Amino acid sequence: MKKKNFLAIILILLISIVGVGCNRGEKSVRTLRVYNWQDYIDEGLDDNGEKVTTSVMEEWAADYKKRTGEDVEFVYNTFETNEYMLNVLKTGSEHYDLVCPSDYYIQKMISEDMLEKYEYDEKNGYKNVPNFNDYGSPFVKNIFESYETLNKETNESLTWANYAIPYMWGTMGFVYDMDKVAFEDVSTWDILWNEKYAKQSTAKNSVHDTYVAGAMHVYKDELLALKNQFEASDKTQEDKDYYNEKITEIMNRFDDETISLVEDALIEMKNNFYGFEVDNGKTDILGGTITINFAWGGDAVYSMDTADEDGNVTLGYAIPEEGSNVFFDGWVMPKGADVELAEDFLNFMCRPDIAARNMGFIGYTSSIAGNEIWELINEWYAVSDDEEGYPVDLSYFFKGTIDQEYLTDGKAIITVYERGRQFDAQYPTADVLLRCGVMKDFGEQNDAVLLMWENVKCGEIGGWLWVGFVMVLVVAGVFIAYQIKLNNKKKRRRRFSKWN
């Protein structure tokens, strides 16, 4: 009996050893899971949406294989709103290694302890994303290294740089028909309330963005007084910092009194504007449905590019004198992410040549600088050698990232052929950015602001009637949006060929 047991044990051990050997031979392939905005990375598509080359994701996988000898796979999915993205993560229905939220949602995710940290310190930057250390714009770096958010779970307050790596950035302003709208009128948020342009303007169907418009309108006198005070100052760095900090504070006032004032202002605005929108405004202005579109900079570029191609209307871009928002989207790693793989991918994304590809594909402005980005914007916007133009100093963005041969007297100066259009939507001057503040999360006043937004959107319509009405509109809107997307897909790509 003992002999049989002994033989059985030997047999089991032999099987186990063979099994281990087989398992070692079957090496598992790592998978990177990425969750991003729609049309927010170069997917290797042509103007008709057909696959013509490798996507950025595929190029990274090939590059990873070349460097490490290991295969890697990826899953790439998209979302349309921050709210939807956050709900997916919180329900646990999907797991991702990298997500690209807006700045105020980065704050929200930090505060709720939803994110992994990057290996980062103030002196040396990102240990495993050196390309961002080398080529990240000093302007964008300063924002992420200056702003802090409190993690409510750990009671630790750290800068955004510990949790996020910037991707794209831009401003909020107005795209407008230059033949029908006066520049002085569109240079103020008041244009949304201006009866001269009744039913000709749109506002964003986004509580954060439209709240800023309301606050800027409510506190216009205070903002213009600040502007005059700054203009009369010596414009020292201390003066500049104070001016920007005050604008940021005003646009992020969420006290009960301000919420009430903004609610009244937005309800009044509804009587004068064409309607709320998120994506349709950039096409409505092309067809003449509206003449003023409250827009993000990247969408403004799309509208102006398309208008130039079609030749039906000349569009411009203006950032209101009172001030506006400068926004940033950044890459964060949800808890449980494959940090090593995520950081490797981001280091690839922060190469200037890859950043230029993405920027050329989607129309928004990359947070990466460097020679390739400088060459790209010169191809797009600079005058020829024998032409006169408008010199613009972009040292605030490119300082320390481009070679000496591109500098003029030590400065990153580009001479552009026109102002107030695509170039200014992508690269506003340092002076303009002084009056642009960063949007903050609503924090403890979140419920109060959302209630205000419901009141603005619903008006006098009864609750359940409004819900039913909205459901009908949503179904119709999805169908219409799908048709628009099909019709306009081939025009979504920038028409510049160098990096496509």
Name the predicted role of every residue range.
Residues 25-112:
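Early extracytoplasmic/lumenal segment of secretory-pathway proteins
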Residues 18-21:
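C-terminal motif of bacterial Sec signal peptides marking the signal peptidase cleavage site
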Residues 404-500:
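Conserved C-terminal helix/tail region of periplasmic/extracytoplasmic solute-binding proteins
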Residues 329, 334-426, 476-478:
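Mature extracytoplasmic/periplasmic domains
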